[in-house]
Amino acid sequence: MTNNPLIPQSKLPQLGTTIFTQMSALAQQHQAINLSQGFPDFDGPRYLQERLAHHVAQGANQYAPMTGVQALREAIAQKTERLYGYQPDADSDITVTAGATEALYAAITALVRNGDEVICFDPSYDSYAPAIALSGGIVKRMALQPPHFRVDWQEFAALLSERTRLVILNTPHNPSATVWQQADFAALWQAIAGHEIFVISDEVYEHINFSQQGHASVLAHPQLRERAVAVSSFGKTYHMTGWKVGYCVAPAPISAEIRKVHQYLTFSVNTPAQLALADMLRAEPEHYLALPDFYRQKRDILVNALNESRLEILPCEGTYFLLVDYSAVSTLDDVEFCQWLTQEHGVAAIPLSVFCADPFPHKLIRLCFAKKESTLLAAAERLRQL
């Protein structure tokens, strides 16, 4: 008999506390302005809050259906048709999840088998690779290069093999703030049309797109959407990240497999929040239609305030993130620079290398501009002093 605790063998031994948690803790410790984690410092729509309170008061406090509240799924179907010219079946094609990250995990788990290869574009959101690993998959990474982070389709085609099972893309792209165009989806289809390859399109920033052509969705591509999962987030759209409500749209056979995983992860999602979101989609569709201008103004406030700094600003076509090059300021690597920036100058940012598996030689950091104007101007004032 031993008193030593039984320690499990880690399935993810290379992972620890995320950089986002680390930088937010460091920001709090040094009372820094937090432009690191991607959440607003302002509240969401008053109408949405009122509808949540209404449904709580009306007793909608028990489990929702596993697939999501019917009214919300129907509202999502109508919105999808309005935006992308395709109406998914509310009963068989749409699943409401506990945030977009759960949708991503459930979709990856449903589609990836042991030994399957999954192509990801680096820099990439940090939840993809662990989910792939837990399903026994192998991540094949394609590095996108600054400042434009475009896909080289010849290089992509060379990555394909008989074991390629899935491609994960993200548009608008976190952290690079670039967007896919319809030509990119056409090129993707040309590359995978002859293969049994699925697609997950992470479109959580679909309504924060500043490009002239607007958001290009996999759901607007007739061939790709037959083998694709589109993932979206109400938290990003309505400035309510703490509600953790997202959804995915996929053809019925794929959705059926996703739901098998979803029912044993969370089973169902916050009932009054779903009902409130259904009300919001029906009553105020102009909210998400106004988001590009809303966040473009915030982007421009930060960009204009940084014009006289020594930071080089990279193009920002979407999301609420901005990349800046600090080569003229410091020779530190990006992790050390972010620590120094937080401790010595009171601004927290995210190093871009944490989004990449391979060594990242560029001196780039990510700033979040989903903040009040006063927050952005105060941060810019400190950054101009570098």
From Swiss-Prot:
GO process annotations (BP): biosynthetic process
Pfam families named in the record: Aminotran_1_2
Requisite cofactors: pyridoxal 5'-phosphate
Enzyme Commission number, as recorded: 2.6.1.88
SUPFAM superfamilies documented for this protein: PLP-dependent transferases
GO MF assignments: kynurenine-oxoglutarate transaminase activity; methionine-oxo-acid transaminase activity; protein homodimerization activity; pyridoxal phosphate binding
Transferase among keywords: yes
Catalytic activity: a 2-oxocarboxylate + L-methionine = 4-methylsulfanyl-2-oxobutanoate + an L-alpha-amino acid
Annotated signal sequence range: none
Entry-linked InterPro entries: Aminotransferase_I/II_large, Kynurenine-oxoglutarate_AT, PyrdxlP-dep_Trfase, PyrdxlP-dep_Trfase_major, PyrdxlP-dep_Trfase_small
GO cellular component entries: cytoplasm
Organism superkingdom: Bacteria
Keywords recorded for this protein, A-Z: Aminotransferase, Cytoplasm, Pyridoxal phosphate, Transferase
Main location: cytoplasm
Subcellular location: Cytoplasm
N6-(pyridoxal phosphate)lysine modified-residue sites: K236
Family: Belongs to the class-I pyridoxal-phosphate-dependent aminotransferase family.
Task performed by this protein: Shows aminotransferase activity with methionine and histidine as substrates, and to a lesser extent also with phenylalanine.
Assembly and binders: Homodimer.
NCBIfam families named in the record: PRK09082.1, PRK12414.1
Name assigned to this protein: Methionine aminotransferase
Source organism of this protein record: Escherichia coli (strain K12)
Gene (UniProt): ybdL
